[in-house]
UniProtKB/Swiss-Prot annotation:
It comes from Coccidioides immitis (strain RS) (Valley fever fungus). This is Mannitol-1-phosphate 5-dehydrogenase. GO terms for cellular component: cytosol. It holds the Pfam family Mannitol_dh. InterPro entries: 6-PGluconate_DH-like_C_sf, 6PGD_dom2, Mannitol_1_phos_5_DH, Mannitol_DH, Mannitol_DH_C, Mannitol_DH_N, NAD(P)-bd_dom_sf.
Length: 388
């Protein structure tokens, strides 16, 4: 019997990153989603194309050997597929993990295969698989929780690949950056060994990879988006072509680099090279990306462990400079009432109805005695006063 992977999330990352590499590693991929349009399209086509874009041009691959299930209508089938799968992955967004946990828990509980299921969440969030693991445990019969590790092993991952705005007529086909990084911790698999997925770099300690990626790629990308949005730019390329915005991005990444170098002992020169590569990637004209898309979900992006507050809070605790990160946070706070982005409307409401202190606590999760708190309050109060 061939290898099988169940993947939650039929979106661009699911099809164009995770699905592509599972296919190339000879897995049959079972896509699971609640969106009728995506599932209907996947069920109606025997293949789709992934076009990798770089400065050297484009290269197209074809993905086949997949099926698709609508979990809204066929949850029992999803559970059955998980019970016989080798791997479960997801790219659904951190806020959706709690909704996919019940069928995963049921599928794991129904397993009779000796080898434990490998579960890897592919989300832009620190410890996303740990979060999913917690939800799975909450949805497992208490008498079966202790033996859960005999049926499934959960490993955190760090993913890095830019998916630009897609052509509205592209259907299932995905245009995606050629560069990628998919790093997964191997320790949880213990004596069983990790699953065979060629694209993955398996490591003992994931923390440096997760924070370096989140606090460089995501911090840089979001900084360009928020400054660009507030300065009337349409795309990230346009934003990064503006010397002022490029300088703001560089300054923010200089601060996050201080943290990465100090905390993990990564050589400063190596981190500088990494930053240069990231700045070049997000400035790529072939990956033209709309600022509203990159900036969407500002509430999540202003969160405690996220791309701004995460590094800034740790730097403040170390007594280091955070001016550029505070500037980027201020721009994120100004990302309000953006069409088709519910969080931007909620952000506007919070800033209108709450005091600066209460809004800061609610948005960032910072404690009032944290060394960063008062400095964020200043920025929140400034934004509440209106346009800069």
């Amino acid at each position: 019997m061939g290898k099988k992977a169940v993947h939650f999330g039929g979106g661009n990352i699911g099809r164009g990153f995770v699905g592509e590499f599972l296919h190339e590693s000879d897995y049959e991929v079972v896509f699971v989603d609640v969106m009728d349009s995506i599932i209907d399209a996947l069920q109606g086509a025997s293949s789709y194309k992934v076009t990798e874009v770089s400065n050297e041009g484009e290269h197209t691959k074809t993905v086949t050997n997949y099926r698709a299930i609508n979990s809204k209508h066929n949850l029992d089938q999803v559970i059955s597929e998980i019970s016989t799968a080798d791997v479960v992955t997801c790219a659904v967004g951190p806020n959706i993990l709690k909704f996919i946990a019940p069928p995963i828990a049921k599928g794991i509980d129904a397993r009779t295969i000796e080898r434990p299921l490998a579960v890897v969440a592919c989300e832009n969030a620190i410890g996303a698989t740990d979060t999913l693991h917690k939800f799975v445990k909450e949805n497992t019969d208490p008498s079966r929780v202790e033996s859960l590790s005999s049926r499934a092993r959960f490993a955190n991952s760090a993913i890095d690949r830019i998916v630009p705005t897609q052509d509205p007529d592209s259907g299932l086909d995905v245009k995606i950056e050629k560069f990628y990084e998919w790093v997964v911790e191997k320790t949880p698999f213990g004596e069983w060994g990790h699953p065979d997925i060629q694209a993955i770099l398996w490591v003992d300690n994931l923390d440096p990879y997760i924070e370096r990626k989140l606090y460089t790629v995501n911090t840089g990308h979001a900084t360009a988006a928020y400054y660009g949005y507030n300065m009337g730019k349409k795309t990230i390329y346009e934003s990064m072509s503006d010397e002022k915005i490029r300088g703001h991005v560089r300054d923010a990444l200089s601060e996050t680099s201080t943290l990465i170098v100090d905390k993990y002992g990564i050589p400063a020169q190596e981190q500088r090279k990494y930053v240069d590569a990231i700045v070049a990637r997000i400035s790529n004209p072939h990956l033209e990306d709309v600022v509203e898309r990159v900036g969407r979900a500002p509430l999540r992006k202003l969160g405690r462990k996220e791309r701004f507050v995460g590094p800034a809070s740790q730097l403040a605790e170390r007594g280091k400079k955070v001016d550029a990160l505070l500037g980027a946070m201020e721009q994120a706070l100004r990302f309000q009432n953006v069409l088709e982005d519910d969080e931007s409307f909620e952000l506007a409401k919070i800033l209108k109805t709450e005091s600066a202190e209460d809004a800061t606590a609610k948005l960032t999760g910072l404690e009032s005695d944290h060394p960063l708190f008062a400095r964020v309050v200043e920025r929140v109060a400034k934004v509440q006063k209106g346009p800069k």
